[in-house]
Design a protein with these regions (language model features):
Chain A
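Transmembrane alpha-helix signature in integral membrane proteins
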Residues: 86-119
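Transmembrane alpha-helices
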Residues: 41-44, 48-51, 130, 134, ...
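N-terminal signal-anchor/first transmembrane alpha helix
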Residues: 2-6, 12-56, 126, 130, ...
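Non-cytoplasmic
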Residues: 53, 57-60, 142-144, 189, ...
Length: 311, 270
């Protein structure tokens, strides 16, 4: 028990019988080692579930399909095909376009809401936040399905408007289109925008706003010169948190996209399903990952710049 | 908070906007239960009349019960394991100085952002190369990866708001590590644990994309629904089933959020 206070804190982790061993002694002394030991089961699962699959996926992307098996001679053919055949580039471009529009729409629509809760709600803030984020935690599939019910050829909007006599024939652009995918994505990912926006707005020192008012800024100038720049990190985080996951979305374009709204995720799924070209699917996944990594770096850079401007 | 002066002035347009926002957020989902009570095989206006027959039909379907049982089994196991892993991860992250900690946290949080389809196909490839057949266990592994970030994110604030001197006091008073954990640490993080269990269960219960790639012959509930979407005549019973799932999910998540936050605000205040 002599070394109990070695780390400056009373030891509450290591159980007494193991203290005699040399390994235990080392663990007892080194905070880092103990921390890593404690977190190791979690890391082990993450390794089995994320790192190993990614390595195999990377290996597979250099193989070629051969009948029902694989030709395991490494080759760049899949990557060359993705680079040269226009369909892949077009699909990637469309995916980024659709999720880009959805991202901008979501952030623009959610900003006033986050602003309202951060500055104008004084009681039950927690309830408001729970209310705004609650749908997000429930079944993604069913929320997308709900939009199919609404936008369908005989869906809520079309049949409702026709029953009211507002339109004569169903509006066909609603279902199986990029518009449908964008609307649905914007709705489904709202919570991912609300939370970072709210956090960054809530952090703003209210006295800065009063200072701006005292110095003669009107509400608009005050917003543009104080609130908006200070909330920029939240805006960037919101864009990142929506744009990245939606580029690879599968369910929404599958249920609502139709041929015009198909995205890269659907194409990847096809390679593992009907087309049965797993190496190609692996290559597409890796290419998508590389794009995501590149975009993440851009966002990181933007965040750094926004932070630097504030402080 | 009390120093806001002009900010206290209510802003009418913003209030109206907030109300509309909430309505738009919730109404689409509400159409599912609305049409599940509609006495027509077609999902369209005008409504034909109220009925419970779609729910009754659901009750007699063997595959629905099987899928429910599969989902519950996977959900419970995933919730327990991911919460345990979340507790030890949150504990390690907050309690010890570890180099590379922020990289570690980023790594754990990765599944939050990276499209699920990539994890799904990557796991599928790994399992098939290793010759492991697709079963509920593989679905569970996929769900574990998806749920872990949420467990850690729920539990981290608990451990961050936790004063280490409490544990030191307990140790000084003669408790050993084990009892200190059970009598001091655990009660203080308990609400976070409950919230994490509820949340991860719901996420696993509702999860689709991982199950889509990793399900063998036993479908989970979302997979069962996906299979039924091809048949227009099944639409009303899918709506009834979806309503029930949404109802349960909303209650569980609301409880999780409520339990997860209430105590947190109290610890911050004190």
């Amino acid at each position: 028990m002599a070394d109990t206070t070695l780390a400056g804190k009373a030891d509450s982790e290591a159980d007494p019988p193991r203290r005699s061993g040399r390994l235990a002694g080392f663990l007892h002394r080194s905070e880092t080692a103990r921390g890593y030991l404690l977190i190791s089961p979690t890391l082990a699962i993450m390794t089995v579930g994320i790192i190993m699959p990614f390595l195999i996926l990377l290996v597979l992307s250099f193989w070629t399909r051969q009948g029902f098996g694989f030709d395991t001679t490494p080759t760049f053919n899949n990557y060359i095909r993705v680079w040269t055949e226009p369909i892949f580039g077009a699909l990637l471009q469309r995916s980024f376009w659709i999720s880009g529009i959805a991202t901008v729409a979501t952030v623009l629509l959610c900003y006033p809401m986050a602003y309202f809760v951060a500055f104008h709600v004084h009681r039950n803030k927690m309830l408001w936040i729970i209310l705004m984020t609650l749908p997000f935690w429930t079944s993604y599939l069913l929320r997308i399905f709900a939009w199919k019910v609404i936008l369908g050829y005989e869906g809520v909007i079309n049949s409702g408007f026709m029953a009211m006599g507002w339109i004569q024939a169903p509006l066909e652009f609603l279902l199986y289109s990029q518009t449908a995918v964008i609307i649905t994505l914007a709705h489904a990912w709202a919570a991912f925008a609300i939370l970072p926006l709210y956090v960054s707005l809530e952090k703003i020192d209210k006295s800065l706003l009063e200072a701006a008012t005292d110095l003669g800024d009107g509400p608009v100038a005050r917003f543009l010169r104080v609130t908006l720049p200070l909330s920029m990190p939240g805006v960037i985080a919101a864009c990142f948190l929506i744009f990245i996951p939606t580029t690879g979305d599968y369910v929404t374009p599958a249920l609502l996209g139709g041929p015009d709204g198909a995205m890269i995720g659907n194409f990847i799924q096809l390679q593992f399903g009907a087309v049965n070209n797993w190496p190609m699917g692996a290559t597409l996944s890796i290419v998508l990952m590389l794009w995501i990594a590149a975009i993440a770096l851009v966002f990181l850079f933007l965040t750094r710049r926004a932070q630097a401007r504030i402080t | 908070m009390s120093d806001g002066t002009y900010i206290k002035r209510p802003n009418r347009p913003l209030q109206v906007y907030a109300v509309i926002f909430l309505i738009v957020l919730y109404v689409p989902v509400l159409f599912i239960p609305l049409f599940s009570f509609n006495d027509s095989i077609y999902v369209r206006f005008p409504l034909e009349g109220w009925t419970l027959k779609w729910y009754g039909e659901l009750w007699q379907r063997e595959p629905v019960w099987n899928a429910l049982w599969n989902s519950v089994r996977v959900g419970v196991v995933v919730a327990v394991i991911s919460t345990i892993l979340g507790v030890i991860a949150a504990r390690a992250i907050t309690r010890y100085r570890m180099p590379g900690k922020s990289a570690l946290v980023t790594f754990i949080m990765m599944p939050l952002v990276i499209p699920g389809i990539i994890f799904g196909v990557a796991l599928l490839v790994l399992l098939s190369r290793m010759g492991i057949p697709l079963t509920l266990y593989t679905v569970g592994l996929g769900h574990l990866i998806v749920c872990l970030p949420f467990a850690v994110a729920t539990l981290l604030p608990r451990f961050e708001g936790f004063d280490p001197s409490m544990e030191e006091a307990s140790a000084d008073l003669g408790e050993n590590g084990w009892w200190t954990f059970w009598r001091v640490t655990f009660p203080m993080v308990f609400p976070g644990v409950v919230a994490s269990l509820l949340l991860t269960f719901t996420i696993s219960f509702d999860e689709f994309i991982m199950a889509f790639f990793l399900t063998g012959t036993d479908p989970t509930l979302p997979m069962y629904i996906w299979g039924q979407l091809r048949f227009p005549q099944e639409f009303p019973s899918v709506l009834a089933l979806s309503s029930l799932i949404l109802f349960v999910s909303f209650i569980l998540v609301f409880l999780a959020q409520w339990i997860g936050r209430i105590g947190l605000d109290e610890t911050k205040k004190s």
